[in-house]
């Protein structure tokens, strides 16, 4: 399968099965499209059929010089020979067997608090309660969860634990106890825990930042962008004050204190801010250089829900963001945007491409009372 598109002055050709990405000139771009119906998908290199080549030459010569056309078709042949164009997905028939394999648990998401100190309008967790009662995870439940992870992780050395909510900092003492317990399990079991925490920042202080900088491999800071956007969707529980003003100075200090360790500012865009590229730019202007902003998830009848007719605007925003992304990088003030962080040299391995997301098999969530 071939996927072709043009963006920011680049002609991009993707060969899906091989994972190859080619940046080409106009004549090669058009040649690839002309030849795809003829060549289709091949298991091994083939020659471009003589008739197909002549037909392509005739068609392309209407627009491009004959010498350029010949060179372009030769380049297409080189890519076919290198098995980087028109390749067949040789693993397609193995998907069923692969997904039936016995898996190990690699990661847990600990719902350390089914409670929250903000009243975000789009919260899928119903202000932290997850359509149930408010609760904080006990150390005993968390301890059993870590024991379960070690016992069911097989020979895997690196394990991940996410502290999530609600707002995890509302149960901070248990977070610290579980990190300490996890560290005690590492050497006897030949494991290494990678801890992550997601926070709205309301309860952040220097002690928490220092602990996280020692123990947390990654920190996710929840913020939606511009003040008016953030405060509309992320109000305080009592409706007084600005969550933006409460959290932004803390997040700026926290990000700076990470000193090279992973963090990112994570926002949500809704129908109210389809111009979300402005919010990403706002993150960068605040001094953050690691960021993500995701489309809201919600019922179709919610006023903030994204609708099908919004998609063209959303696609346009990603294009605008790409322009700004390149511009700022050239100016020496670049930033990383999560969805643009694609390693073109080290793409997903075959196992990952076949298995997809590990949620529910390799990655499980644990409620405060110990349910998976």
Sequence positions of predicted segments:
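Accessory C-terminal segments flanking Radical SAM cores
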Residues: 1-30, 338-372
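Flexible, acidic/Gly-rich N-terminal and inter-domain linker regions that tether
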Residues: 1-106, 118
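Short, histidine-centered active-site or binding-site loop motifs used for metal coordination
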Residues: 16-17, 28, 126-129, 163-165, ...
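Short, solvent-exposed loop/turn segments at secondary-structure junctions
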Residues: 18-19, 115, 168, 202-203, ...
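Short, compositionally biased low-complexity segments
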Residues: 43-56, 119, 150, 285-299
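Conserved alpha-helical substructure of the radical SAM core
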Residues: 64, 71, 75-79, 83-210, ...
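Radical SAM/AdoMet-radical enzyme domain recognition
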Residues: 142, 146-162, 171-296
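Radical SAM enzyme [4Fe-4S]-AdoMet core and its adjacent flexible, acidic
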Residues: 228, 232-245, 252, 256-360, ...
């Amino acid at each position: 399968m071939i996927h072709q598109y043009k963006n920011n002055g680049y002609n991009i050709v993707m060969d899906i099965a091989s994972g190859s990405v080619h940046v080409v000139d106009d004549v090669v771009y058009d040649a690839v499209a002309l030849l795809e119906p003829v060549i289709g998908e091949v298991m091994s290199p083939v020659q471009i059929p003589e008739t197909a080549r002549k037909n392509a030459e005739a068609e392309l010569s209407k627009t491009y010089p004959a010498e350029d056309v010949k060179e372009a078709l030769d380049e297409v042949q080189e890519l076919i020979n290198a098995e980087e164009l028109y390749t067949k997905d040789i693993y397609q028939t193995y998907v069923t067997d692969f997904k039936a394999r016995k898996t190990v648990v690699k990661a847990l998401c600990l719902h350390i608090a089914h409670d929250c100190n903000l009243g975000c309008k789009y919260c899928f967790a119903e202000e932290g309660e997850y359509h149930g009662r408010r609760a904080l995870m006990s150390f005993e439940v968390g301890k059993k969860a870590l024991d379960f992870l070690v016992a069911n992780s097989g020979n895997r050395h690196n394990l991940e634990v996410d502290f999530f909510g609600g707002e995890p900092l509302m149960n901070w003492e248990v977070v610290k106890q579980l990190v300490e317990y996890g560290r005690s399990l590492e050497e006897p079991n030949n494991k290494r825990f990678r801890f992550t925490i997601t926070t709205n920042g309301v309860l952040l202080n220097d002690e928490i930042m220092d602990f996280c900088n020692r123990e947390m491999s990654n920190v996710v800071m929840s913020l939606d962008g511009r003040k008016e956007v953030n405060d509309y969707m992320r109000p305080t529980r009592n409706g007084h004050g600005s969550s933006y003003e409460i959290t932004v100075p803390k997040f700026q200090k926290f990000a700076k204190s990470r000193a090279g360790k992973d963090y990112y500012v994570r926002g949500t865009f809704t129908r109210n801010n389809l111009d979300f590229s402005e919010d990403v730019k706002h993150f960068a202007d605040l001094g953050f250089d690691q960021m993500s902003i995701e489309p809201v998830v919600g019922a179709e009848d919610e006023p903030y829900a994204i609708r099908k007719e919004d998609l063209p605007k959303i696609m346009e925003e990603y294009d605008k963001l790409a322009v700004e992304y390149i511009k700022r990088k050239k100016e020496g003030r670049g930033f990383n945007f999560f969805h643009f962080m694609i390693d073109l040299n080290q793409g997903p391995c075959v196992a990952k491409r076949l298995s997809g997301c590990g949620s529910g098999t390799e990655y499980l969530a644990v409620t405060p009372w110990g349910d998976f």
